[in-house]
Amino acid sequence: MKLLSIAIPCYNSEAYMEKCIESLLKGGEEVEILVVNDGSSDRTAEIADAYAEKYPTIIKAIHQENGGHGEAVNAGIRNATGLYFKVVDSDDWVNEEAYKQILKTLEELTRGPKTLDMLISNFVYEKQGASRKKVMQYRHCLPVNEIFGWDSVHMSKGKYLLMHSIIYRTKLLHECGLELPKHTFYVDNLFAFEPLPFVKNMYYLDVNFYRYFIGRDDQSVNENVMIKRIDQQIRVNKLMADAFHNCQFDSKHLKKYMLSYLDIITTVSSIMLVRAGTQEALDKKKEMLEYIREQDLWLYHKLRYSILGRAANLPGRGGRKMFVAAYKVCQKFYGF
């Protein structure tokens, strides 16, 4: 059995996927690389097949009709044979030295008395044109170099476990029944959220492993693109609220963390709807909150009357301008 399966969702990725694959090949035979061609119309399929032919014991090319990023991740999970599972997007890459430490740590932990559910590491925002590179690290929030549970997690505002920082135990993803929606962007938030109640122990390795590229005009996190795809963001937001509502929490620290994560996602949805500047968008914002209220009144009050929730719902045009201005300041300060 391979130690780590890595899925690379690819859609028309010919311009950058090779850099991603080459960075992952440094893992050698301990790693299984699943290149998922999600119905591409460029040379993505050809490149995937060429790598699979050259490295038959490491790389597997998977071809499917276009189903979106989530379905590509689903295909990766279905085909993974490794003990652990990670997603690396085709325009991103990993640091070689950190990669070696990740594999060494996973190997050592598999020989230990406990089965590890999730390994956490740092990621770096590789933002094009940025004066500094922001590192998302967790050294003041999580114990370092030891196995721990949710009671040891103390996340501050602005700190979240994103897809880029997470490696799950593969069987855990099967056990929790994770199935990401098709033809929907922003499902990485569901990937980093829904399985958490099944995670009983974690390990934090303080290395800058994942390099998260930001800068392509067509990238899903581009603000203008997000506004155009706001219905998909709202869909993910609602699915996260559903997951929270249906969860039977056995840790107050886990509940607090997941509530905080849902709070920031709801705020991002609100920001984009306000930035859209249309009455239709404002109606969608109201409808999203109403959906949560009908599903879970307790959750609605927690989100609507949090600090972020109050800011997102300041009355009138002036209130909306203040909200957007505050967002721009945070965006510049935090580097996202």
Predicted segments — roles?
Residues 22-31:
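Short, acidic, metal-binding catalytic loop of nucleotide-sugar glycosyltransferases
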Residues 23, 37-46, 68:
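A conserved acidic beta->alpha catalytic loop
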Residues 30-39, 60-65, 89-90:
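Short beta-strand/loop segment that forms part of the nucleotide-sugar
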Residues 64-80:
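Glycine-rich, basic loop-to-helix element that forms the pyrophosphate-binding segment
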Residues 69, 92-202, 214, 218-226:
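Donor-binding/catalytic cores of nucleotide-activated saccharide
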Residues 85:
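Short aromatic/hydrophobic "clamp" motif used to bind/position activated sugar donors
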Residues 184, 201-236, 276-283:
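Nucleotide-sugar-dependent glycosyltransferase catalytic core
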Residues 275-336:
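Membrane-interface aromatic/basic loop that binds lipid-linked glycans or pyrophosphate carriers
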